[in-house]
Amino acid sequence: MTSLVGNMREHLEQIIEKINNNEYFGVIRPSDGEFLILENHTFTAQTGDDWTNKSDGLLREHLKEAIKNINPKLYIGIPCNTCGHSPSNMYDDYLIKYQVPKTNLTYANIFCNSNWSRTIEFLKSYEKGFFLITTGTLECDFPIKERCYIDKFLVNNWNEVWETETERILNYIKDKQNELICFASGPMTKVWIPKCMELNPNNVYLDIGSVLDCYTKGTIRPYTDPNTTYSKECCIFL
């Protein structure tokens, strides 16, 4: 699998081309929230699901393991070092402290900000349809074949339920072939997608995060408003 090249917009077009060419791969996007978990903070997310991570939990260790993954077919999106929204050390810390492989690198915002409209356009017009692992229950006009629901407070109880929930997700995808499987399951996505790829590499696994939230949850992110600066931003690594 070749490395992605160029800015965020160019990366997205390369991802879409790979999907249309029936290539199998995965994308995970550890960003600000995952960074706080890795840095061992206790905090409550302000994302609409409002889960709480407690320091010294197992999720921190599972994330560390996941983002060091050297599977050449797994792209790992991290915050860029040019937009200035994230702490200035985050880009370097992901690469050096947490050992994200640079050959696998893409942008944490690859499906968001100025790429959101293009991502929505692609998902809505994807004729084969896709599976969605999510907490969102609202009906919407997307070709979703089926939803696999998770508890929106799963982070809170991860220490107790991670084995059974991970097994449930793996059982859900194990027999699927040549499918697009989208994950909107917060930090757990970063743990699950590498495991799914190992068990069953014959699919595309995308960490779409909050991309469909305004449709499946009724919650609005700033980048979905064309009048915000977020909706116009296109990241590039320097």
Residue spans of the language-model regions?
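A short, acidic, amphipathic alpha-helical segment used as a generic capping/interface helix at domain edges
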Residues: E10-L12, R60-H62, E163-I173, M188
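Electropositive, gly/pro-rich neighborhoods at or near active sites that engage anionic ligands
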Residues: M1-K145
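C-terminal functional extensions of proteins
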Residues: M188-L238
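A mid-sequence, solvent-exposed acidic-amphipathic segment
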Residues: L138-E179
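Residue-level detector of flexible, active-site-proximal loop/helix-junction positions
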Residues: C83, N157, L212
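Short catalytic-loop micro-motif centered on adjacent basic/acidic residues
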Residues: L180-A184
